Amino acid sequence: MKEVILDAQARTVGSKGDLAFLRKSGKIPAIFYGKGIKPEAIAVSSKVFVSIMEANGANVIINLNFKDGKKAAIVKSLDRDFLTQHTIHIDFHAISLEDKIEVLVPVHIAGVADGVKNFGGVMEFIVREVKVEAIPRNIPQKISVDVKALRIGQGITVADLPELDGVKYVQDSSTLIVHVIAVAAVFEEEKPEAMAGGTATVVQPEVIISKGKKDKEDEEAEKGTSVASPTTATGGTKK
């Protein structure tokens, strides 16, 4: 994972009007939490955060720059506005750079399969991400797989993925990632998603589309609950 710095400022849990004003001023309300850490309400620059996501994707170590120093975190989940798709809330989960964590890493397909190029087959993606375990700095931004040799009826499983230093695949080794099928099979099985390139499974981070429900801070303030930590390789409970 790459490392970036993002300034974070403390904020109070206010009303929906306060949150709307915060967003109009170019800030995104967020929560910083983790195992043994009291959740902190913070705000970050919308412009800087969006540029970080566009340049690095979700798998990036974000060193939140507080007044009392930097704290390492990853993006656990995002809330997006239903109409504009703008990010309106972020969950930052605290991490230790020395402890292993489990995250989803996107799989990148390199080349055009022989069965597609020369025999009219269709590439069908079963999963687009795989779960790995590693210390944060060893987690790759993506995992590349060469599919040029694949013929119709052949595929790639987790067991076929390249070995990476310090990285362990924690999904079942027999999990099928991508395969090449005949066009006839696509119509017989009624899988229009195969023609469109397949569908993704769980994404990292989780994206929540807001349809006008109460903001997360309002719900937390009313319920008086704390934000739980997700499971890592060193223990904890998943959010």
From Swiss-Prot:
It holds the Pfam family Ribosomal_L25p. It comes from Endomicrobium trichonymphae. NCBIfam families: bL25_bact_ctc (TIGR00731). This is Large ribosomal subunit protein bL25. Residues 226-239 have a biased composition (Polar residues). This is one of the proteins that binds to the 5S RNA in the ribosome where it forms part of the central protuberance. One of its GO terms (cellular component) is cytosolic large ribosomal subunit. GO terms for molecular function: 5S rRNA binding; structural constituent of ribosome. Residues 211-239 are annotated as: Disordered. The keyword Ion transport does not apply. Coiled coil: none annotated. The keyword Ribonucleoprotein applies. InterPro entries: Rbsml_bL25/Gln-tRNA_synth_N (IPR020056), Ribosomal_bL25/Gln-tRNA_synth (IPR011035), Ribosomal_bL25_b-dom (IPR020057), Ribosomal_bL25_C (IPR037121), Ribosomal_bL25_long (IPR001021), Ribosomal_L25_dom (IPR029751), Ribosomal_uL5_bac-type (IPR020930). Part of the 50S ribosomal subunit; part of the 5S rRNA/L5/L18/L25 subcomplex. Contacts the 5S rRNA. Binds to the 5S rRNA independently of L5 and L18. It comes from the Bacteria. GO terms for biological process: translation.
